Each structure stands twice: as C-alpha cells, then as structure tokens.
Amino acid sequence: MTSNTDKFRLLHTMLRVRNLDASLDFYTNKLGMKLLRKNDYPSGEFTLAFVGYGDEESEAVVELTHNWGDNEYELGTAYGHLAIAVPDIYKTCDELAAQGVRIPRPAGR
C-alpha cells in the first residue's frame, strides 16, 4: 500500500452498456442522478456518459461506456453491485417497481 492515502478518493465505476438511452433513462429518471457530461469519440467509436448525485470534484460517479455497433456483453461473475444509500429502501424499491424496474432481490423480503 502507498504510505499516504489520505488524499485518495474513489472517482467512478465504469459500466459497459448496450443501450445508452435506456441506461441514461434508468439512472436519471428512475434513480434521480444527473447527467454530468456526455462525450462522443468518433475515432474510437464509443460514447462516455457520466452520471451521479453530485459533481465529480467531490462525489464518486458512474461512467457509462457505450461502444458503437452491436456489441454483446456477457454478464461477468466478478461484478457484484453498485451501492446507493437511500432513506427508505422498502419505499424506494416499491417506487422503482411501480416504474417497471425489475428488482431481482427485494430488500429484506
């Protein structure tokens, strides 16, 4: 380990997405995050979109990477989850389910 980590902070986690519009809808309209920035990279044929609850200078954010074309991604076994703190998990799950979001393992139920 580096001897001085007091200035370290988590910047972002990156997820590859097939449908950027659907992913942005989920993170912004369902989870209430803000689209912080979005950039196309034509020479690399990909788009990066960053979403989060605060600015990137002080908060960790989610980077959504959309590779152009018909890329299929396998569900990896190493990725576990994103943890988001909410005031009432049961109410939040109910609200998300009412919006058509599939809750694979409802909290405490």
State each model region's role.
Residues R18-D21, E59, N67-R109:
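Vicinal oxygen chelate
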Residues F8-L10, Y79:
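Core-facing hydrophobic residues within beta-strands of well-ordered domains
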